[in-house]
Amino acid sequence: MGYYYRWEDFPPREISYLKGRPEASKLLVRIMSSARMMVTQINAKKGAFVPLHHHEAEQIILVLKGQIRGTTGKEAPQMIGPGGIWVVPSNMPHRVEYVEDTEAIEVVSPPRMDNFVGYTLSHTFFDE
C-alpha cells in the first residue's frame, strides 16, 4: 500500500537539535519519515548554519535555491548552488553554512531521531 502526502501536511518548525542555539530561528524544516528513510524540506535564511557534527545517517542534500557552503571532514569547503548535490557518508563530521536564503531537500537513512527529540547525552552530536 502506498501513502501520499503534501509538504503542507507537515508543519514547519525549528530543528530540535539546535534548540537554544541562536541560529535555530534561521532554519525551518518540514520532516517526513518512513521506517528506513527521512526526507526534510529545508528553508534557511542567509547566515544560518549547522555547526560541525556527525551522525549515523548517510545524508544527501539537494539545493533547490540559494547557496550553501558545505564542509565534509577535513576537506576544503565547497560551494553548492541550485541543482548541486552534497553526499555526506555515515559518521563523517560536517558543517553547513547558508550563504544565501536557501531552499533544499535532505534525504537521510536511517531516520535521525534527534530531529524529533534532540540528543540528551553530551558530545554525541556536535563536534565544535
Language-model features and meaning:
Residues 1-36, 121-128:
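A short, N-terminal "cap"/entry segment at the start of jelly-roll beta-barrel domains
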Residues 38-54:
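Conserved short histidine dyad/triad with adjacent acidic residue
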Residues 46, 56-57, 76, 92, ...:
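A generic "binding-loop/recognition-motif" signal
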Residues 57-68:
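Glycine- and acidic-residue-biased ligand/ion/polar-headgroup-sensing regions
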Residues 64-65, 81-82, 100:
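A cytosolic small-molecule/anion-sensing beta-strand core signal
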Residues 74-90:
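Short acidic-glycine-tyrosine-enriched beta hairpin
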Residues 90-114:
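Ligand-binding loop in jelly-roll beta-barrel domains
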